[in-house]
């Protein structure tokens, strides 16, 4: 069942533009972090993800924004700098929730799902690089299912996506390589294993 869900996710259309019909209530835009440079500054992929997240936030003014990423460098976490960048680009501080403990995609998903549950947020638009999106969707779906089992409810959470295109073309972005598939299944197995014990 898990694998068939993942195979479906691998066929997901990656959106390079913010979709028009996103939910208008109980909706979160989740922007995934990217490792900071050694000097504690944001690298290009993270800034590009933020630009996509900003476009989604401006188009959906009722949505909360969750910035996710720990791993401190020079006293900064990804989430801290992401929040500062969004605020400097006109997003109100009250809209932004930070998840600054995670060190990888599995933890991003687990810790962010806890925030979604706590804040009563249902549906999610994930924002990350095209090369990372299928893995992120797989793990976030698994995290949501795990929480549902743990608290004995069905959140019926819907995931949408907007990507920063880090491929020469969208056609290439939609081609799942063997390496990418292996990493997705590895993280899925790890996520499932981590959460069972």
Functional labels for PLM-detected ranges:
Residues 64-66, 97, 125:
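A structural signal for isolated positions on well-ordered beta-strands in alpha/beta enzyme cores
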Residues 32, 68, 99-101, 128-129:
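Short His-Asn-centered micro-motif
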Residues 1-28, 32-35, 87-89, 93, ...:
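Extended hydrophobic blocks
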Residues 39, 75-76, 105-108, 134-136:
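Extracytoplasmic/secreted cell-surface and envelope-processing proteins
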Residues 31-62, 66-86:
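Membrane-embedded segments
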Residues 39-46, 98, 175, 179:
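Short beta-strand elements at the ligand-binding edges of bilobed clamshell
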Residues 47, 102, 106, 110, ...:
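Glycine-rich phosphate-binding loop at the start of an alpha helix
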Residues 70-71, 96-106:
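Short beta->alpha junction loops
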């Amino acid at each position: 069942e898990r694998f068939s869900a993942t195979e479906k996710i691998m066929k997901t259309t990656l959106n390079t533009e913010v979709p028009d019909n996103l939910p208008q209530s109980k909706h979160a835009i989740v922007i995934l972090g990217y490792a900071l440079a050694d000097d504690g500054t944001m690298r290009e992929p993270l800034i590009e993800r933020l630009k996509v997240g900003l476009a989604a936030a401006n188009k959906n003014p009722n949505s909360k924004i969750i910035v996710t990423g720990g791993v401190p460098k020079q006293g900064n976490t990804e989430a801290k700098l992401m929040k500062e960048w969004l605020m400097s680009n006109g997003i109100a501080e009250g809209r932004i929730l930070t998840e600054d403990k995670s060190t990888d995609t599995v933890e991003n998903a687990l810790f962010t799902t806890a925030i979604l549950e706590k804040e009563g947020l249902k549906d999610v638009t994930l924002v990350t690089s095209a090369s990372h999106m299928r893995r992120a969707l797989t793990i976030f779906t698994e995290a949501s299912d795990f929480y549902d089992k743990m608290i004995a409810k069905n959140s019926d959470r819907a995931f949408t996506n907007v990507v920063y295109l880090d491929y020469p073309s969208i056609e290439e972005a939609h081609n799942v390589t063997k390496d990418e598939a292996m990493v997705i299944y590895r993280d899925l197995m790890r996520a499932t294993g981590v959460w069972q014990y």
